[in-house]
């Protein structure tokens, strides 16, 4: 539900956006991961939509840094700092990482979601940023919307939707 004066900012594949209240950040995920940063006291947030855990060539991440967890998450941290939020003022929620390629005879494709989840968790732990909530794995894609007025996330998955209110 849009509140007065708010607008939806879509976060595309291999993309990142930062905004403040009353904006809404939204993305749709399959095996990709949506990383949601939110600073409740400042009503500022950022969201990245990355596709893969690491750049196997080490070259593509220079052109497409939000395609990979290893470059997207540090850039999210930098974006939060640029918007005036220091570590300790924000927390993180993680979404996506579904197994979307069942029946495909490729272990790489079958494990993309799982690898994305594990890599994102490891980078967040190394960065000492609290991961307070996640809805990851499974076989269903998701659409997530971060409402920057209060930090709630609307999660749509498997024909159902629910609001997640945990922000600290």
UniProtKB/Swiss-Prot annotation:
A GO molecular-function descriptor: protein-glutamine glutaminase activity
Entry annotated with the keyword Hydrolase: yes
Reactions that this protein is recorded to catalyse: L-glutaminyl-[protein] + H2O = L-glutamyl-[protein] + NH4(+)
CDD domains assigned: CheD
Domain of life: Bacteria
InterPro entries: CheD-like_sf, Chemorcpt_Glu_NH3ase_CheD, Cytotoxic_necrot_fac-like_cat
Family: Belongs to the CheD family.
Family annotation (PANTHER family): CHEMORECEPTOR GLUTAMINE DEAMIDASE CHED-RELATED (PTHR35147:SF1)
Entries under HAMAP family matching the protein: CheD (MF_01440)
Name of this protein: Probable chemoreceptor glutamine deamidase CheD 2
Gene name tied to this protein: cheD2
């Amino acid at each position: 539900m849009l509140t007065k004066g708010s607008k939806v900012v879509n976060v595309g594949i291999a993309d990142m956006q930062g905004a403040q209240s009353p904006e809404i950040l939204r993305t749709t995920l399959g095996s990709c991961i949506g990383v949601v940063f939110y600073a409740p006291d400042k009503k500022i947030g950022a969201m990245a939509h990355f596709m893969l855990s690491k750049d196997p060539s080490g070259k593509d991440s220079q052109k497409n840094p939000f395609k990979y967890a290893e470059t997207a998450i540090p850039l999210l941290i930098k974006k939060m700092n640029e918007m005036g939020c220091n570590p300790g003022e924000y927390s993180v929620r993680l979404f996506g990482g579904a197994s979307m390629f069942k029946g495909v005879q490729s272990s790489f494709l079958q494990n993309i979601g799982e690898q994305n989840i594990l890599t994102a968790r490891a980078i967040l732990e190394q960065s000492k940023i609290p991961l307070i909530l996640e809805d990851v794995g499974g076989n269903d894609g998701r659409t997530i919307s971060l409402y920057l007025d209060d930090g709630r996330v609307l999660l749509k998955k498997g024909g159902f939707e629910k609001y997640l209110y945990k922000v600290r």
